[in-house]
Each structure stands twice: as structure tokens, then as C-alpha cells.
Amino acid sequence: PIQITWTGYLDTTGLKEIDYIIADPFVVDKEQENLFVEKVWRLPDIWNSFSQPNYNIKVGMLPAISNKFVTFGSFNHLNKINNSVIKLWSTLLKKIPKSKLFLKYKSLNIDYYKNSIVNKFYNCGIHQDQLILEGSSPREDLLKTYNRIDISLDPFPYSGGTTNFESIWMGVPILVLKGKKFISKCG
């Protein structure tokens, strides 16, 4: 049998038993092939796919128009929001007056994780009133929540995948810091 790795782990498996990794010319360029045990199988345009949600959700107006401030957002797994990400995003919030950061992920239903995020941003000079923190919700409600943010922020070095597709689907542009490896080129 032929074994192929794809979405879910965006690096070499390190296993000679895995024959291929699916990629594209952007996420794994020719010079990086030697970093993979697997043979790189490049799709011509994009390595991933996204299916249209089964919900009829309208893309809303830019929230900054009515809010009179910019709302950045990230609905990625909290493990992707490391100290370097928090430091950079805090710098962004400080440079744009009245701006807010909306984080949404299931861990934020738990006070421990919510308080941890608040404290990490506070240590970078960001007060709690600049943060909007929400836990999980059904997918339809999650997609509607994109109508509350102006610009999505992509974490690094582990960028978003499905989260970025959802943001684009809902008409919200994404601010990305391109990395050098597959895992940090998905934004």
C-alpha cells in the first residue's frame, strides 16, 4: 500500500513508511524537499481544501464603521498564541488607538485559561478592556462571529488552517507573518 500524509500535521512525519506528503509550490518549495522523509507531492494551486458551510450567513458591514475602533481577531487554538505572538499583537494594539483583540476558542470557557491570557497581555501593556474573550459555540454561531471583527490575525510560527479559510469565507482579511516552514506558510 501507498501511505500519504496531509492536513493535520504540516511537517515531515519522519517515518520512512509514509510515502508522500501533499503540499503545493508555496508551502514547500524545491529547496525544502530535503527536509522531508516523504516524497513531496505538490498540487498545482493549493494543498488544502475548504467546503462551503451549509449555513446562509451574510457577510456583515465592517464593524469599525459603527464601533469607531478596529477589532482584530483570532479564533485559533490557544496553543498557537505563544509569548512572541502576544508580544507582537500587543505592540499592534498599542499602535492603533482604541483597538481591541477578540480571541475565541473553547479553552476560553475555562477561567484558568481566560485569566492566563489576560495576564500575558497585561504583562505586555494591554488592559483587559482591550480584550474580548469568548469560548466555544456551534459552528454556525462561530462563523457569524466573524462579522464582529475587522481583521483576523494569524498566529506564528504555527499558522491557522481551517480558521483562515473560515475568515476569508466570511469576508475578513487576515494579517499574516510568513514563516520558512510548511507549518508557518498556511496563512
Where do the model's predicted regions map?
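Structural detector of well-ordered beta-strand residues that form the stable sheet scaffold
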Residues: 1-5, 22, 102, 154, ...
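Conserved catalytic-core segment of nucleotide-activated headgroup transferases in glycan assembly
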Residues: 46-138
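Glycine-rich, histidine-containing beta strand-loop boundary motifs that form or position
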Residues: 6-8, 105, 162, 178
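Active-site-proximal region of nucleotide-activated glycan assembly enzymes
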Residues: 1-62
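Catalytic binding pocket for nucleotide-activated donors in carbohydrate/polymer assembly enzymes
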Residues: 147, 151, 155-187
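Short acidic active-site motifs
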Residues: 140-142, 163
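Alpha-helix C-terminal capping/helix-to-coil transition sites in glycosyltransferase folds
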Residues: 17, 145-148
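Short, glycine-/Ser/Thr-/acidic-enriched flexible segments
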Residues: 11, 26-28, 47-48, 77-80, ...
